[in-house]
Amino acid sequence: MHLTNVAVQKRGADYNQHHGGKWNLRHCRLHVEATRGRAAAARLFADMDRLIVDSLRAVQAQIINDRHCFECYGYDILIDDDLKPWLVEVNASPSLSATTRADRVMKLALIRDVLDVVLDEGTAARDRPMRGAGGFEVLHDEAGERSAAAAAKPRKRGR
């Protein structure tokens, strides 16, 4: 729902003071399921997952990989009438200031979920219980890919 700056949206006749033009992913998915069906919603969310993974893979060499820090990215995605997602921009360290009560609730949940994920040391992402990952899900597990590929390789036998 969020496409332009909130300061600009607030002046529009269609501005909703309750949610400020922002929905969480659950509400977005429920809306798409109600208006287009579950299969269409599943395709849309799979396409958005792929878009996010592809964008991160495209810049992975530039992303700092340090176990002592993390980054939260904000994705602005436009969904057209055919339910095709278009990447508008990716924000490094997006604003966490809230413009409405609903926005505050959503952002506090985001912060809690991010901390649940990054503070769970010593457990591989694929082995973490989902309750410890908040509303997040693993979209791509590169470490799991490497270990699966290594396990599938034929091993040389020593003589």
What are these language model-derived features?
Residues 1-72, 82-85, 104, 109-146:
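Catalytic core of tubulin tyrosine ligase-like
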Residues 77-79, 84-92:
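A short beta-strand motif that forms the metal-chelation/ATP-contact edge
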Residues 91-99:
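Glycine-rich phosphate/pyrophosphate-binding beta-alpha loops
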Residues 147, 153-159:
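Intrinsically disordered, low-complexity intracellular terminal segments
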